[in-house]
Curated annotation (Swiss-Prot):
<dbReference type="GO" id="GO:0036222">
    <property type="term" value="F:XTP diphosphatase activity"/>
</dbReference>
<dbReference type="InterPro" id="IPR002637">
    <property type="entry name" value="RdgB/HAM1"/>
</dbReference>
<keyword id="KW-0460">Magnesium</keyword>
<comment type="function">
    <text>Pyrophosphatase that catalyzes the hydrolysis of nucleoside triphosphates to their monophosphate derivatives, with a high preference for the non-canonical purine nucleotides XTP (xanthosine triphosphate), dITP (deoxyinosine triphosphate) and ITP. Seems to function as a house-cleaning enzyme that removes non-canonical purine nucleotides from the nucleotide pool, thus preventing their incorporation into DNA/RNA and avoiding chromosomal lesions.</text>
</comment>
<dbReference type="Pfam" id="PF01725">
    <property type="entry name" value="Ham1p_like"/>
</dbReference>
<protein>
    <recommendedName>
        <fullName>dITP/XTP pyrophosphatase</fullName>
        <ecNumber>3.6.1.66</ecNumber>
    </recommendedName>
</protein>
<keyword id="KW-0547">Nucleotide-binding</keyword>
<comment type="subunit">
    <text>Homodimer.</text>
</comment>
<dbReference type="GO" id="GO:0035870">
    <property type="term" value="F:dITP diphosphatase activity"/>
</dbReference>
<feature type="binding site">
    <location>
        <position position="41"/>
    </location>
    <ligand>
        <name>Mg(2+)</name>
    </ligand>
</feature>
<dbReference type="GO" id="GO:0046872">
    <property type="term" value="F:metal ion binding"/>
</dbReference>
<dbReference type="InterPro" id="IPR029001">
    <property type="entry name" value="ITPase-like_fam"/>
</dbReference>
<feature type="binding site">
    <location>
        <position position="71"/>
    </location>
    <ligand>
        <name>substrate</name>
    </ligand>
</feature>
<dbReference type="GO" id="GO:0009117">
    <property type="term" value="P:nucleotide metabolic process"/>
</dbReference>
<dbReference type="GO" id="GO:0036220">
    <property type="term" value="F:ITP diphosphatase activity"/>
</dbReference>
<comment type="similarity">
    <text>Belongs to the HAM1 NTPase family.</text>
</comment>
<feature type="binding site">
    <location>
        <begin position="9"/>
        <end position="14"/>
    </location>
    <ligand>
        <name>substrate</name>
    </ligand>
</feature>
Amino acid sequence: MKQKIVLATGNLGKVKEMSDVLADFGFEVIAQTELNIESPEETGLTFVENALLKARYASKMSGLPAIADDSGLVVPALGGAPGLYSARYAGVDGPDADAKNRAKLLHVLHHIAPTHRQAKFVSCIVMLQHEHDPSPIIAEGECYGEIGFAEKGENGFGYDSLFFSPEVNCTFAELATSEKKKISHRAKALSVLQTKLATKGA
């Protein structure tokens, strides 16, 4: 029998990407939206703090173990922006948020030369057995690339169509989901999580 765990996100892209992998770990993933749990205000100053906030809240509201991911795009030429504010970079919510965020990123980078458009995706995953778990499992992953001058690809979500990965010589949005799962920041963090779970005997 699989262990139920609440995934603390309402982002459908993350739900699919993480559910595919977590199912292999023996977990039955329930998105917090299925339980009518809303996300708390993200007041942390780091990806780890925000992931902890979300996981603790989801566990508190559901009474189940919880897992949360906080991730973002870091562009050194912009002083680390969008960073913690990647999901709300353009200041809008709703179905148009991703497109508006990408448009803003292209706009603020329009004068930046190709040699200075480096970027990295960061993912921090936190897993709790219960709301007050004193020793949460924390797993982090990063992947490096650069921001293109135009969107390419139809797959993925968020900034995927702008993030060019030298490792695969295309944007994340040009990859099939199965290919992205092998190299993405979230995939790397989930791999670290899997190792830590095995070590902990969870």
